[in-house]
Regions:
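Auxiliary tRNA-acceptor-end handling modules of aminoacyl-tRNA synthetases
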Residues: 26-304, 322, 326, 337-393
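Bacterial Sec-dependent N-terminal signal peptides
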Residues: 1-26
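Conserved structured catalytic cores and adjacent interaction surfaces
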Residues: 332
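Solvent-exposed, polar/charged alpha-helical surfaces in well-ordered, non-transmembrane soluble domains
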Residues: 310-317, 321
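Alpha-helix N-cap/helix-initiation motif
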Residues: 305-309
Length: 393
């Protein structure tokens, strides 16, 4: 009996020792598998939003900092190369809005902010300004890892970037006979890819190649159209913190504008649309006319035929006459993109005059811009010019 008790106690001590070691090993394993350890094997792209990529499986992650939660970012998407029959083409500005990241338990939600309505802040009605006005929930992504200080959150964004959750990509051009409409099909997840991560202090960009599949498509221009690629660039931009002054649109004059409805107004037409305009500031505010602190710079893309470059440059600089009437001297400057430039015209940090020669272009010229939807401030612009404009083919 005594011997049995001794053996039992020895066995119990041994079991408890194993349990303690196992628990310690588990804690060590959990610690080793923390955020920092997980990121060690990933490629880091430092910028506005820190991005990490697993070069083995191609998965892409956002590292969201605590001070980036609830913060507004400008979101912009444009086509790098498309298919005219699917309503997309190079330089096509696809989408523009404001998003923010919201922590919800073990998820990070990505909200698209509704900026269509405004209130007079002195009116008591403004206290109910969120009533029945809904933001759009783009996606909700599980937090993969959290820093020990709980101020950094890692989310995988691969599926987000390779879907139409951020923006609807294709819109088929209208045709009277629906049977003649080109049907691009659906996104092929295994064929689509994140081709590039481009990160800067003020914007985080991704170049995505979407492949759409539709086995029933007939050839276009003698090309197999069952699998079609559309390349686009997503940009997440730091919200501008400056002294830009919005300007309400005068309905008697045509402007590109941000639509705003004042829900506290008694006016029968309570519209306070904000015009899209550049942020120009006089260097010498005391003078009636002054050069700007930062001029508007347009680049002539290196795809532009040599004989056209002086003509294009002079045409753009002619806008300085109008700007001078508004008080700005040399508001616009024009430069030529070098052939060996290390940046592409798809980089939103540059305003570019671009030339293309497409098989079936939808226009001769096209001049879009993207803005801060809250204020109307133009953040960038491109001018697309097609060779067909000159050849008239």
């Amino acid at each position: 009996m005594i011997l049995n008790k001794i053996l039992f106690r020895i066995a119990l001590i041994g079991f408890l020792s194993i349990s303690i070691f196992t628990e310690e090993d588990n804690k060590k394993e959990e610690k080793d598998d923390g955020l920092d350890a997980f990121l060690e094997d990933l490629t880091h792209f430092e910028g506005l939003i820190d991005v990490y990529r697993n070069d083995d499986d191609g998965k892409v992650y956002f590292l969201i900092k605590k001070d980036q939660l609830e913060k507004e970012f400008i979101y912009f998407a444009h086509i790098l190369d498309g298919i005219v029959e699917a309503g997309t083409w190079r330089g096509n500005y696809l989408d523009n809005g404001i998003i923010k990241f919201i922590k919800y338990f073990d998820q990070i939600r990505i909200d698209r902010v509704n900026t269509a309505y405004v209130f007079d802040e002195t009116n008591p009605l403004s206290k109910s300004k969120n009533a029945n006005i809904s933001n759009s929930l783009i996606d909700s992504l599980k937090i993969q890892k959290t820093s020990e200080t709980e101020d950094k959150f890692l989310i995988e964004v691969t599926s987000l970037l390779l879907s139409e959750n951020l923006s609807k990509i294709t819109v088929a051009p209208y045709k009277e006979d629906p049977k003649e409409s080109f049907k691009i099909g659906s996104i092929s997840k295994n064929k689509s890819s994140i081709n590039a991560v481009l990160n800067y202090p003020e914007n985080t960009d991704f170049e995505i190649n979407f492949v759409f599949s539709n086995a029933s498509n007939k050839p276009i221009e003698n090309q197999d159209s069952r699998n079609n690629s559309i390349s686009l660039r997503y940009s997440f931009i730091n919200y501008p913190e400056n002294n830009f002054e919005p300007r309400i649109e005068d309905q008697r004059i045509g402007f590109f504008s941000e639509r705003k409805t004042n829900l506290s107004s008694t006016d029968i037409t309570p519209y306070e649309d904000l015009i899209n305009k550049w942020h120009l500031e006089k260097k010498d505010k005391d003078n009636e006319k002054s050069v700007p602190i930062k001029p508007i710079t347009f680049w002539i893309e290196n795809t532009t035929p040599y004989e056209l470059r002086p003509i294009i440059k002079n045409a753009v600089l002619a806008w300085n006459i109008a700007f001078e009437e508004a008080g700005f001297i040399d508001a616009i400057e024009v430069k030529i993109q070098p052939d060996d430039a290390d940046w592409s015209a798809g980089d939103i940090r540059y305003n570019v005059l671009r030339w293309t020669s497409s098989p079936n272009p939808p226009f001769g010229g096209y001049g879009p811009s993207f803005t801060n939807p809250r204020t109307g401030e133009i953040l960038g612009a491109d001018i697309m010019l097609e060779w067909i404009y000159l050849t008239n083919r």
